Amino acid sequence: MNNYFFLYIFLISFSFVSSQSKLKKDTNAIMKMCGCFEVTFNFSETINLNNRENYKPSEDYQTSPVYELAIPIKQDKNHISIQHILQVGDDNYRSIVKHWRQDWIYQNKNLYIYEKDNKWNYKNLNKTNYKGQWTQKVYQVDDSPRYEGSSSWVHVDGKSFWENTTPAPLPRREFSKRKDYNVLLRSNRHEITNYGWFHGQNNEKVDRINSIEEEVLAFEVGYNYYKRVANDKCKYAKEWWLENEKKWDIVRNIWAEIYSQNKNLSLKSEYNG
């Protein structure tokens, strides 16, 4: 009897230590996405799946290298928030742009899943569906919702990566150009590399009528490279954030109150008042 008891205690202890070790690896991988990076964004529509007579695929989208500061604005055991800030131009002309934000939450059960037309449906996950997983919550430049997904970080063969597929609104590069689809089904891969990190995408451009009827118009691939550089390359972005972070703290807190209601969200394109 005692032997079984000690075996049980050993297995429980081993499981706990293993879980804590995995959590530390996950956290270290996420924190490696912070810093100053030289970034390039590259997208290409690869396969046309529709038979629409007047269909016009998107042109390839490639950017020149820009600096992007990814700064941790919250960091605890189960929640890491990273604000991205673009720094474009040189001493003759420089522009600072508050870019996207990503929150990583461990074993999160509350998701907002994008439906279409600026509508997100609240979803409460079962524990078996989020145990050991991290939710990546991605926000627009104004901290409004964009897309969310829950998956496990994987550490194998010297690689650390996280993969997930989730619906999202049209990207900014297409929002003003394309009206023939209304959902981008994003398959994201975030992988930590020896040069920084890589954001790969295999996306589907979807014309969604309702929860049952939809058409996949085309496939798209994306290759976004974040190459780590010296921190002083992003000094203007950091200065801008130090001057403006309190204002954005207020904005985030207002949005946090809305998200905490755990209800479906619908955003208006215009506000009259």
Question: Residues of each region from the PLM?
Answer:
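Positively charged n-region of N-terminal signal peptides that target proteins for export
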Residues: 1-6
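Hydrophobic h-region of N-terminal signal peptides that target proteins for export
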Residues: 10-19
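Acidic, serine/threonine-rich low-complexity disordered tracts
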Residues: 182-189, 194-273
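Short helix-loop boundary/capping segments
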Residues: 127-185, 205-207
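N-terminal helix-cap/turn-to-beta initiation motif at the start of protein domains
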Residues: 21-36
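Short, solvent-exposed loop/hinge segments that bridge or flank secondary-structure elements
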Residues: 22-26, 42-77
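Hydrophobic/aromatic beta-strand elements that line small-molecule binding cavities or substrate pockets
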Residues: 57-74, 83, 99-103, 185-192, ...
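Low-complexity, serine/threonine/proline-enriched polar segments
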Residues: 74-77, 81-155
